[in-house]
Every structure is written in C-alpha cells, then in structure tokens.
Amino acid sequence: NIEIKILDSKHVKNLIDLIKRCYGMTYFYKNFYCENYIKNMIDSNIIKAVIAVNSNNKIIGHITLFKNEIIGNVGLIGATDKCFLGEPAMLMIDPNYRKKGIANRLIRYLLNNLNLFDKNLKGLFCPPISKHVYSQLLMYKNGFKDCGCLICYYPKVNLSHLNNNNQRTSLLLTYLPINMKSVKTIYLPPLYKDIIIYIFNNKN
C-alpha cells in the first residue's frame, strides 16, 4: 500500500535519500542535498512537501509546493511585493515505483489540499524543463496550460535518467488558475495583441 501525506521535517534525511536514488548527485537544486536547508525551508513555511511512502514507511515519491515567495526557476530576484502564486516542483519517483500512477496521486493530493498550504493562492505555475516530457504531460493531465517558454534559459542540465546533450535547457511555463474572483482590465500593446490573446485563450 502507498500512502500520500505531508512530509514532517523530522524525516528530511529520507527525502534526501530519495533524491540520491533518483538523480545521484546530479540534481540541479543542490541545496536540497543539505538536511538543515530543507528543514529551515519547511519550518519557515516557504515550502510544503508531499510524499508517498510504502508499507515500510520508506519515501518513494515526492512533490514540493513553493509558496508565497517569488522563488524558483522564473522568479524575480529582489522583488518586494507579496506573491500569491505557488510552484509545484521537485516531482520525483523512486525508480522501482515508476509507472504506477504515484506521480499523479501526489499532484492530486496537492491540488485537493491547497488550503492546508496557503488559503490566499491565486494560481499555480510550473516551469518544467523541455527535455522532461513526462512532467509536461502530467501537468496537462491536471489542468495546467502552456502560457510561455523561456528558450535556452538554463545552461545545459545533466540528469542521470535523461538523454543529455550540449544544448542549453529551455523551460515551458504552465499555469493553473485557482482563484478567479477578481477581474482586472489589461490594455494590450497592439504589436503583441494577437499572440497575447492566443496564449490567454489557451489557458482559459
């Protein structure tokens, strides 16, 4: 039996073990090999980690929600305005448990329990790297829509379980609206009006 639950900071070491099983030492969030760093992020309420554990209480899956911070792959460093977007990130499944629907269960748990994380979220954005097709398909399955692309945004990323080359890495930007109560008037520059309307219609 696989149980989905929120990670307690006491079990962070088990999460690091999962990262190493999935990526070795190639994971690009290098700080997440540091136990104290993750504990501080959890205790400071910057992240909430959702995990999947097996019958032996071993962590075999994980996704993290970065919240109420301008943080992550496309953040505006140094901005002072409060951000009401969350970023689902760091989705990973133990190699021995893949293709069993665990990743989708983790995302569904996160989406169904957003109020436990932050009641003020307006939406979720997720910028999967272009070479990780599975994560893109998973976002689409759960209602995220493409709203942009950062071409060659990162230097080349080498991950132990993907085909790697010397190309720089691009990011897709996907978005899921959560709270659509407020209405904003946006005045579009004529030069970009058609493409902006196209993107907006795509994400509903």
Language-model-detected regions and their locations in the chain:
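Conserved catalytic-core motifs of GNAT/GCN5-like acyltransferases
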Residues: 125-127, 140-163
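A short, internal acetyl-CoA/4′-phosphopantetheine-binding micro-motif in the GNAT/acyltransferase core
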Residues: 89-100, 128-130
